[in-house]
Amino acid sequence: MPLINLPAFAGDLLADFERRNTLRVDTPVIQPAEPFLDMAGEDLRRRIFMTESETGESLCLRPEFTIPVCLRHIETATGTPQRYAYLGEVFRQRREGSSEFYQAGIEDLGDPDTAAADARVVGDAMFVLANRLPGERLKVTLGDQSVFEAVIAACGLPGGWQKRLIHAFGDQKQLERLLAALADPKSPGVFGHDVERVAALGMLEDEERLVAHIGETMKATGYSTNAGRSPRDIARRLKEKVELAAIRLDKEALGVMRAFLALDLPLADAPAALHRFAGKARLKIDDALALFDARVAALARAGADPGLMRYRAAFGRPLDYYTGLVFEIGVEGTPAVLAGGGRFDRLLTLLGAREHIPAVGFSLWLDRIEQAIAAGRAE
């Protein structure tokens, strides 16, 4: 189906992609919903347009391109390394603007030199934006999920709390709520009278008794176990929730995490600052810092202007599949995000790839770029 109402710069943008050694691909507008619901993150999940096939399969209008491009790569058994480019419509509910809009971008799959690939993708995004917005000063914000994960692991947090914090990475308010919860452990009573009662009866320490109690309660209230989670699933989730709520992180560890999340400085200064932080906090995060250092060095070798880039330790993006680098690009002095991306090394394996495929990429919001071009002309 031909694309209509494309921005005037679309042809030049595609030519830029071709010069960056990419293969242009398209994907169906109607997509299986499950991969997005499982892997895309809560922020995107609640904005997806859902539908259903005649056979009952959950489907959705394409809300983004990364997952469809990766699925296409797996289905066509294309070798790697491979760089894909795309331009097409995506569909998601937005607070501002149309729910149907154009995105374009590059997905860089299979390069084992992750630092070089990260630098290349950031450079690609800066290149195509600079060509659309000559004379405008860009600003680049970078974060690193792998460094964040290394810090919370080194602080000694239980796995359940690590998952919660990783899930909240990039959401400053949610991270603060979770840190506040870690500073103020709760008793089972905060979850209601019923949970307090089963705790008093010792059922939280006896999973079989708890499972039987939940099963009897479900049966008595007419709740079908086929309609949702099983009694055992509910019991395990309840135990985990109560156990996590009772955990307190000592003041020193909380101070370390807050000191890390407060780091916000020019990217060129970030490696030294992170090493100082790790040394002062006595955290063994050498592997994560080595990867971070390699990426900063690769960006310098690629000729990226360090004056445009800033590292924020608390910066993340609202998609669950990111594993390392995350970044956004806009115009200095304006709030609009024109490009965003990052590394997603686990995604292709989760989607069914038979081997590990490192991956990194970015997306462009063409409507926002069009508005930025118009604003520049009006000045």
From Swiss-Prot:
Keyword terms, alphabetized: Amino-acid biosynthesis, Cytoplasm, Histidine biosynthesis
More about this protein: This function is generally fulfilled by the C-terminal part of HisG, which is missing in some bacteria such as this one.
Entry keyword Iron: no
Cellular component annotations (GO), alphabetically ordered: cytoplasm
UniProt cross-references to Pfam families, sorted A to Z: tRNA-synt_His
A GO term, aspect molecular function: histidine-tRNA ligase activity
Location relative to the cell: Cytoplasm
Family membership noted in the UniProt record: Belongs to the class-II aminoacyl-tRNA synthetase family. HisZ subfamily.
Protein name: ATP phosphoribosyltransferase regulatory subunit
Its biological purpose: Required for the first step of histidine biosynthesis. May allow the feedback regulation of ATP phosphoribosyltransferase activity by histidine.
Main localization of the protein described in the UniProt heading: cytoplasm
InterPro entries (alphabetical): aa-tRNA-synth_II/BPL/LPL (IPR045864), HisRS-like_core (IPR041715), HisRS/HisZ (IPR004516), HisZ (IPR004517)
Subunit structure: Heteromultimer composed of HisG and HisZ subunits.
